[in-house]
Design a protein with these regions (language model features):
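Multi-pass alpha-helical membrane architecture of UbiA-family
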Residues: 1-351
């Protein structure tokens, strides 16, 4: 959770001038402490909520039956109290963000997704993608903590207008919002994308004017790559429980694909992940032009593809020891590659 937020700082934690140098509304250590606190409390609340909601199922699966709540060492009331206390702690840390009200609006989609996640396997075979969304949302909150808008939905979800806060994008701001961010040079990979429902559905007559959704391309691609990274890892982890999931009627990517085709699905996710990281680098503003340096491409897309590719190739989905080893240790290879690639961009851009 914290790593996803830290990655956002390297992926565009502010924008200051035509050279692509970055400036932050707060000292970098202050922002990192905020992200550490928010990640700590959110992770506690999310894990406890997942265990609480899953307790009736966990007691039916040998691998999870000895967890604290199913075995009765922690009462459901105590677990719920722990969830609420840590959720309150996460909410309090939002007060330290440059725009607390805006930070809450950006956090709300992930709050709802995290509450739903334990029930996703009851309704769909794609709970790994739901989990990926929840964990990758740290990219959004890392951007917001740095004073950046990773996306804006009209005036409904955006940061409070403030000329002192840098923006990841400002090409399509609605009238009445004035920011001093210069427009980057044209590129084949635009730094922003604007989606308008009336434009996307030209043959549909809407009785209202829906707000336009403006997306920062670097953050959209980094968010997608982070979500797929988590989905790949959790799919390997979920392979341990495929027999119990089939017996209980629960869904997962291994259940959907079967163990024989799960690796093919993982290779497909990895290809999309690598493509997103390449697009992220191509759309980053910098050096008077647009695009990341060669160090980014070598470490982020290259390193992640190599590390995840080795994991998908080597893991034995039928061996719990193999899946657990890769789930536990392979994380550091991918995380290190991402931190190194995006960190190389951040170091060269901070004012």
């Amino acid at each position: 959770v914290l790593l996803a937020a830290i990655l956002a700082r390297g992926g565009g934690g502010g924008e200051g001038n035509m050279d692509g140098n970055f400036g932050f509304p707060q000292p970098w250590w202050h922002t990192c402490l905020l992200l550490l606190g928010a990640s700590f409390f959110f992770s506690n609340a999310a894990h406890a909520w997942d265990d609480l909601a899953d307790a009736p199922i966990d007691i039916l699966i040998p691998r999870t039956a000895r967890r604290p709540i199913p075995r009765g060492d922690v009462s459901r009331l105590a677990a719920l109290t722990f969830v609420l206390a840590n959720a309150a702690g996460a909410g309090i840390t939002l007060l330290g963000f440059p725009d607390p009200a805006g930070a809450f609006r950006y956090a709300l989609p992930n709050i709802l997704a995290t509450v739903y996640y334990p029930y996703a396997k009851r309704h769909t075979n794609l709970p790994q993608l739901v989990l990926g969304f929840c964990l990758a949302w740290g990219v959004v909150m890392g951007a917001v903590a740095s004073g950046c808008e990773p996306f804006a939905l009209g005036d409904i979800i955006r940061l409070h207008p403030n000329n002192n806060l840098p923006r990841v994008f400002s090409l399509h701001l609605p009238q009445g919002h004035h920011h001093s961010l210069p427009i980057p040079k044209p590129t084949s990979i635009p730094p922003t994308l604007t989606l308008n429902l009336n434009t996307l559905l030209p043959f549909t007559s809407l009785s209202f004017n829906p707000p336009a959704l403006t997306l920062s391309t670097p953050f959209l691609t980094l968010l997608t790559a982070s979500a797929l990274w988590s989905a790949i890892y959790d799919t390997i982890y979920a392979a341990e429980d495929i027999e119990a999931d089939l017996r209980l009627g629960l869904g997962s990517l291994p259940v959907l694909c079967g163990l024989q085709r799960t690796k093919s699905a993982l290779w497909g996710l990895l290809v999309v992940l690598a493509g997103c990281l390449v697009l992220c680098g191509m759309s980053l503003p910098g050096g008077g032009d647009v695009g990341a340096g060669w160090v980014y491409y070598a470490l982020a897309p290259g390193g992640c593809t190599a590390a995840l590719g080795a994991m998908v190739w080597s893991v034995d989905l039928r061996d719990a020891r193999s899946t657990w080893w890769w789930f536990r240790y392979g994380y550091w290879l991918v995380g290190g590659a991402l931190v190194g690639g995006l960190g190389s961009e951040l170091i060269g851009r901070v004012d």
